[in-house]
């Protein structure tokens, strides 16, 4: 909140004849927007109206906000804007999954919409690239560029909802669940991820249940310990290995926060969270003859024996030059059955969107190349093969 307050103070103190950068209202939670309106000399309830217009109705044009008087609309146009990422590329899978490359400044991030019979999940990115260098993940090959802002995170939800066509029909939600499982490590961008999730939960905005907003982390333990003090959402842990020796190799952050340290933190979170039904989701990617043996299943059962959890087994999704192979169905089934002998709930995740590189672990794909080509196109003004959506 401090950053946004500083931003507002700077904006409102600028002399009238000097150019001022407009504040993006999507960077503000409703409470922060109420402070913004107080700074403008307006009633704080105006923030409630604006939030409804932006997120319930998908409106980004002040002139269309009919219950706000013209004088205030003109004042807002002078100092503020409503700006979400634009879609640079859209791909649709045969199974109904949609992947968008969203333009964020000079870079792109990927957002995935996964419709099912009883729900529709949006997978949202939190960073441009990722610094954690997990060896089985395509995003890791991009490296880390920067954190996304609040507006770039919540703007993915806004843009997807706009495309899917929810706006104007409140109460009917084509997006029922949001998972922070896209590009990046959310707990390395807490300052922007938490406010974005607050907007997702806000009844004046998207009004999602805290059980339908999931944060996935590879295990940034200090941030996880602080998370429950800031917000309560569903938690998923990208574990992927049952022992420190193997996890050090494939999830390098384990060298800093080992499995015991991580699981202890998870258990602390579960004691105060109401969003998890008392259970955490454990994500485990299946790598052929790397982490998918029966002995690994027994080790995993031992690691999780005191942690209420649901285990998702994720068939690995290949990407170019990766040093792994996908586990066979036989090995995955055997792994599942071994864990179920310990009375764990174990689900084999159905692969969605793999024909458009939208499946788990595939995000980034050719987004690196597209980002470079987009920058070159802007620099040289030439058509160099970037497919854009207008």
UniProtKB/Swiss-Prot annotation:
Task: Please name the GO terms that the record assigns under molecular function.
Answer: 4 iron, 4 sulfur cluster binding; metal ion binding; rRNA (adenine(2503)-C2-)-methyltransferase activity; rRNA binding; tRNA (adenine(37)-C2)-methyltransferase activity; tRNA binding
- Residue positions annotated to bind S-adenosyl-L-methionine are 184-185, 216, 238-240, 317
Using the record's annotation, list all stretches that form the Radical SAM core domain. Answer: 116-355
The answer on whether this UniProt entry bears the keyword tRNA processing reads yes
InterPro entries for this protein: Aldolase_TIM, Methyltransferase_A, RlmN_N, RNA_MTrfase_RlmN, rRNA_lsu_MTrfase_RlmN/Cfr, rSAM
Keyword set, alphabetical order: 4Fe-4S, Cytoplasm, Disulfide bond, Iron, Iron-sulfur, Metal-binding, Methyltransferase, rRNA processing, S-adenosyl-L-methionine, Transferase, tRNA processing
Similarity comment: family membership: Belongs to the radical SAM superfamily. RlmN family.
Specify whether Iron is a keyword of the entry. Answer: yes
Which segments does the entry list as coiled coil?
none
Enzyme Commission number(s) of this protein = 2.1.1.192
**So where does [4Fe-4S] cluster get bound?**
130, 134, 137
Q: What does this protein do?
A: Specifically methylates position 2 of adenine 2503 in 23S rRNA and position 2 of adenine 37 in tRNAs. m2A2503 modification seems to play a crucial role in the proofreading step occurring at the peptidyl transferase center and thus would serve to optimize ribosomal fidelity.
Cofactor dependency: [4Fe-4S] cluster
Gene Ontology BP, a term: tRNA methylation
Q: How is the cofactor bound, in the record's words?
A: Binds 1 [4Fe-4S] cluster. The cluster is coordinated with 3 cysteines and an exchangeable S-adenosyl-L-methionine.
The disulfide bridges present are 123-360
- Recite the lineage of the species: Bacteria, Pseudomonadati, Pseudomonadota, Gammaproteobacteria, Pasteurellales
Instruction: Kindly provide the name given to this protein in its UniProt entry.
Output: Dual-specificity RNA methyltransferase RlmN
For this UniProt entry, what is the primary localization, expressed as one broad class? cytoplasm
Q: Which GO terms describe its cellular component?
A: cytoplasm
Q: Which residues are catalytic?
A: 110, 360
Q: Which reaction does it catalyse?
A: adenosine(2503) in 23S rRNA + 2 reduced [2Fe-2S]-[ferredoxin] + 2 S-adenosyl-L-methionine = 2-methyladenosine(2503) in 23S rRNA + 5'-deoxyadenosine + L-methionine + 2 oxidized [2Fe-2S]-[ferredoxin] + S-adenosyl-L-homocysteine; adenosine(37) in tRNA + 2 reduced [2Fe-2S]-[ferredoxin] + 2 S-adenosyl-L-methionine = 2-methyladenosine(37) in tRNA + 5'-deoxyadenosine + L-methionine + 2 oxidized [2Fe-2S]-[ferredoxin] + S-adenosyl-L-homocysteine
Localization, UniProt: Cytoplasm
Q: What else is known?
A: Reaction proceeds by a ping-pong mechanism involving intermediate methylation of a conserved cysteine residue.
